[in-house]
């Protein structure tokens, strides 16, 4: 038997040894997947995941490069860092309390409460309609990121980095999250029949007013 044949045989043996382990791991995952499979719509889930990526690309790098091209050369890096920092800070804020305030199961018509803070009560089987709730939360997070980033154009070249972070954090916490609940989270505006398919109210009106006030 040649050396190559021995090597091939040893490789096959090692693969067969790993097969039972892989089967056990797959068996552990099957029950949880089966529980979520009944209500899961694969096409809708795939589309929301695609949309999540597209909205994220609107901010990073889309919006950051757009604003970077409108300023003087010495301020390009500052604008890019502002957009990237907003994405990081708002992502953390969304995980901590943002999703809960915007989409928590509260009886209040003005905010969602804190029952979903740190994604409490959300697991692999949690559903939002016919898609996983984690996918829905990720999709909505991209809107929470791009909204304060839109305001950057109002103060570009005229604000400290630390002041920008503080304003965006407080503005998102006290303006964006509640308004998202009012419209998309079953709040009082939604109950009155307001329909916002693409963020015209939640994103653009709030960001526009915020930019006008801070300009």
Give, region by region, the residue ranges found by the protein language model.
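Hydrophobic alpha-helical transmembrane bundles of multi-pass membrane proteins
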Residues: 3-215
């Amino acid at each position: 038997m040649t050396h190559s044949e021995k090597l091939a045989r040893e490789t096959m043996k090692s693969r067969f040894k790993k097969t039972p382990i892989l089967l056990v791991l797959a068996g552990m995952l099957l029950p949880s997947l089966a529980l979520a499979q009944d209500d899961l719509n694969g096409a809708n889930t795939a589309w929301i995941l695609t949309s999540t990526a597209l909205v994220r690309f609107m901010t990073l790098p889309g919006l950051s490069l757009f604003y970077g091209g409108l300023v003087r050369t010495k301020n390009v890096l500052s604008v890019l860092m502002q957009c990237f920092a907003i994405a990081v800070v708002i992502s953390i804020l969304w995980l901590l309390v943002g999703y809960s305030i915007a989409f928590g199961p509260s009886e209040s018509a003005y905010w969602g409460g804190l029952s979903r803070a740190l994604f409490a009560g959300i697991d692999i089987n949690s559903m939002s309609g016919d898609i996983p709730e984690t996918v829905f939360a990720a999709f909505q997070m991209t809107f929470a990121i791009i909204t304060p980033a839109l305001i950057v154009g109002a103060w570009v070249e005229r604000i400290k980095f630390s002041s920008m972070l503080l304003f965006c954090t407080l503005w998102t916490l006290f303006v964006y999250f509640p308004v998202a609940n009012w419209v998309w989270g079953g709040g009082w505006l939604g109950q009155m029949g307001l329909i916002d398919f693409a963020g015209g109210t939640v994103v653009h009106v709030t960001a526009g007013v915020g930019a006008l006030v801070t300009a």
